[in-house]
């Protein structure tokens, strides 16, 4: 992806919550850490949960899987509800922001926005756009990149040089119309992972996260955060 490049966001609830606050989201939903994937640790996550963001490494194994998955879906097809808000990623390192947009856009009816919210405005103006049009609109939407840069510098680890190649990537896992969708701006379409509900979203999303980890057992760079009712 040549063209625009942003500083990467951390999978850090403090950073993501501050970012959403700057975008005009009322803190009635907040990101929290998912400390582990077994039932005992998942029980510590406040409920309800309306989205999970997974940060994972883009490895050779993953890229092989991604290509195979894409080809399989193209040949076999899949059901995707038109209610899913999905956008492509054309800006390098913007996957964290796009993950947040995917999480909020697909739960807009649960969110409270402050008056003049730049995120609400972006979602309203891009509602009828195609995934590619939304990507181009984000490139020209000045308010979000400025906020993103501020948040990238607020992380616990030092922000990398903007030209540095980053091999970590965010995806969002959300519940729309009874199904669990993986939303990844690097992919041509949402991935339907089967049935879910508001009550089981966290557990169902974590099952998908586990598959990412199983594909790369030598990798440790996985991190999940959940969007929970505050």
From Swiss-Prot:
Top-level EC class: hydrolase
Highest taxon, organism lineage: Eukaryota
Site feature Transition state stabilizer, where: 89
Reaction catalysis annotation: Thiol-dependent hydrolysis of ester, thioester, amide, peptide and isopeptide bonds formed by the C-terminal Gly of ubiquitin (a 76-residue protein attached to proteins as an intracellular targeting signal)
One Gene Ontology CC term in the entry: cytoplasm
Start and end residues of each UCH catalytic domain: 5-229
Active site (record annotation): 95, 169
Annotated compartments: Cytoplasm
EC number from the UniProt entry: 3.4.19.12
Activity regulation (record text): Inhibited by monoubiquitin and diubiquitin.
A GO term for molecular function: cysteine-type deubiquitinase activity
PROSITE patterns: UCH_1, UCH_DOMAIN
Keywords from the named record: Cytoplasm, Hydrolase, Phosphoprotein, Protease, Thiol protease, Ubl conjugation pathway
Described function: Deubiquitinating enzyme (DUB) that controls levels of cellular ubiquitin through processing of ubiquitin precursors and ubiquitinated proteins. Thiol protease that recognizes and hydrolyzes a peptide bond at the C-terminal glycine of either ubiquitin or NEDD8. Has a 10-fold preference for Arg and Lys at position P3, and exhibits a preference towards 'Lys-48'-linked ubiquitin chains. Deubiquitinates ENAC in apical compartments, thereby regulating apical membrane recycling.
Subunit relationships: Preferentially binds diubiquitin; the interaction does not hydrolyze diubiquitin but, in vitro, inhibits the hydrolyzing activity on other substrates.
Family (UniProt): Belongs to the peptidase C12 family.
Name of the protein: Ubiquitin carboxyl-terminal hydrolase isozyme L3
Naturally occurring in which organism (per UniProt): Sus scrofa
Lineage of the organism: Eukaryota, Metazoa, Chordata, Craniata, Vertebrata
């Amino acid at each position: 992806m040549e063209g625009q490049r942003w500083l990467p966001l951390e999978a850090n609830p403090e950073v993501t919550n501050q970012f959403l606050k700057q975008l005009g989201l009322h803190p009635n939903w907040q990101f929290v850490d998912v400390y582990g994937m077994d039932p005992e640790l998942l029980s510590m996550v406040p409920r309800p949960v309306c989205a999970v963001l997974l940060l994972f490494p883009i490895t050779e194994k993953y890229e092989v899987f991604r290509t195979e998955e894409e080809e399989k879906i193209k040949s076999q097809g899949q059901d995707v509800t038109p209610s899913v808000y999905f956008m492509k990623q054309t800006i390098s390192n913007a996957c964290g922001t796009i993950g947040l947009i995917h999480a909020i856009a697909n739960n807009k009816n649960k969110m409270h926005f402050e008056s003049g919210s730049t995120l609400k405005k972006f979602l309203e103006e891009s509602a009828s756009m195609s995934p590619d049009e939304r990507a181009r609109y984000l490139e020209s939407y000045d308010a979000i990149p400025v906020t993103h840069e501020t948040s990238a510098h607020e992380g616990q680890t030092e922000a990398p040089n903007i030209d540095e190649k980053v091999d970590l990537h965010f995806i969002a896992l959300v519940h729309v119309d009874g199904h669990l969708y993986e939303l990844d701006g690097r992919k041509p379409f949402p991935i339907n992972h089967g049935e879910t509900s508001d009550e089981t979203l966290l557990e169902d999303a974590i099952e998908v996260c586990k598959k990412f980890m199983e594909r790369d057992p030598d990798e440790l760079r996985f991190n999940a955060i959940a969007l929970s009712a505050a």
